[in-house]
């Protein structure tokens, strides 16, 4: 085969369809028309003489051939993107882009502070932050769409051999109450008192919820007996609900600095129980690590917690 039956732009279109779930959304994300997307897909299928999408479904569903093409096409695109970034680093070590991922709470309350420190010292480096679930962020690092990420949960089991995971710092979770609650006058309550509270919590599948339930159960507190009155989708919503007197909750200490200073919320300890989770830095063993990424890890993360960030093992023999 002398001429390739597809271009890099066409591979980008196929990847966008897979990520966005439809031709229309893919077109919007790429700033092109939907007919243009359909035309490119039709041309590839014509060149390959094979169907890439199952059109009997409402959403864009890849056929087996489409999945195979995207498997290798994704690698091609990632390698091209790495090549461009490597050349950019070679041209100017202090220039470039840094794309960081973070899970919800970490991305909302911790990362802006760290990125602020980094930008003060390296204002010429562009930093992008993407905040999603731990699972989605882990896959983005594995696919080369992120340079690194900081997460508060475990990476998917299928990615453990692909991702390098290094513990960063402990994040303490604390019980919060409205100032009007009777327990707010105490600095510490007994674990049995938790059964008397009404709780506002994140979804059961959230990382923080799983950590809290696991630690409470380990300390003799049956999390299934806690009265969960309401489940909300964000920490901000939970804080507002607690401030309004609707119940109590567990949140990261990093999320309530302002509320504690303004006395909008009270933090109450539980006797002999500390609820902590480990935040981890994840990178991809096999991906090129940009100068900006190494600088962020060494000078920002390493500086804050005295953690020297190690490079991935060499593949040279």
From Swiss-Prot:
**Places the protein is found:** Plastid, Chloroplast
- Where is this protein primarily located? plastid
The feature table lists the DNA-binding region at: 23-42
Q: Which GO terms describe its cellular component?
A: chloroplast
In this record, what's one Pfam family?
Answer: HTH_1
Where does the record place the HTH lysR-type domain? Answer: 6-63
Q: Which UniProt keywords apply?
A: Chloroplast, DNA-binding, Plastid, Transcription, Transcription regulation
* InterPro entries assigned: LysR_subst-bd (IPR005119), Tscrpt_reg_HTH_LysR (IPR000847), WH-like_DNA-bd_sf (IPR036388), WH_DNA-bd_sf (IPR036390)
Q: Which domain of life is it from?
A: Eukaryota
GO molecular function per UniProt: DNA-binding transcription factor activity; transcription cis-regulatory region binding
- Protein family per UniProt: Belongs to the LysR transcriptional regulatory family.
PANTHER family given for it?
Answer: HTH-TYPE TRANSCRIPTIONAL REGULATOR, HTH-TYPE TRANSCRIPTIONAL REGULATOR CYSL
What is the stated purpose of this protein? Answer: Trans-acting transcriptional regulator of RuBisCO genes (rbcL and rbcS) expression.
Could you tell me what this protein is called? Probable RuBisCO transcriptional regulator
The organism's taxonomic lineage, starting at the top: Eukaryota, Rhodophyta, Bangiophyceae, Cyanidiales, Cyanidiaceae
- GN (gene name): rbcR
């Amino acid at each position: 085969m002398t001429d390739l039956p597809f271009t890099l732009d066409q591979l980008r279109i196929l990847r966008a369809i897979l990520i966005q779930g439809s031709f229309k959304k893919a077109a919007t994300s790429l700033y092109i028309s939907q007919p243009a997307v359909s035309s490119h897909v039709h041309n590839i299928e014509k060149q390959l003489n094979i169907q890439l999408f199952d059109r009997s479904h409402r959403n864009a569903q890849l056929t087996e051939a489409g999945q195979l093409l995207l498997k290798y096409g994704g690698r091609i695109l990632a390698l091209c993107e790495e090549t461009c970034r490597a050349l950019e680093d070679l041209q100017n070590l202090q220039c470039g882009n840094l794309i960081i991922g973070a899970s919800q709470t970490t991305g909302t309350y911790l990362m802006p502070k760290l990125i602020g420190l980094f930008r003060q010292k390296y204002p010429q480096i562009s930093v992008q932050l993407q905040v999603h679930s731990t699972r989605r962020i882990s896959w983005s690092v594995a696919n080369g769409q992120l340079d690194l990420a900081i997460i508060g949960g475990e990476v998917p089991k299928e990615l453990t051999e692909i991702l390098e995971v290094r513990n960063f710092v402990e994040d303490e979770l604390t019980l919060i109450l409205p100032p009007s609650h009777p327990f707010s006058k105490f600095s510490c309550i007994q674990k049995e008192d938790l059964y008397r509270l009404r709780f506002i919590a994140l979804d059961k599948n959230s990382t923080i919820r799983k950590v809290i339930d696991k630690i409470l159960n380990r300390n003799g507190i049956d999390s299934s007996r806690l009265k969960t009155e309401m489940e909300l989708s964000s920490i901000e919503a939970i804080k507002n609900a607690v401030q309004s007197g609707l119940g109590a909750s567990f949140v990261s200490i990093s999320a309530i600095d302002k509320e504690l200073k303004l006395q909008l919320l009270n933090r109450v300890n539980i006797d002999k129980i500390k609820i902590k989770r480990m935040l981890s830095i994840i990178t991809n063993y096999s991906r090129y690590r940009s100068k900006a990424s190494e600088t962020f890890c060494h000078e920002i993360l390493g500086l804050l917690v005295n953690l020297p960030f190690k490079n991935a093992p060499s593949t040279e023999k």
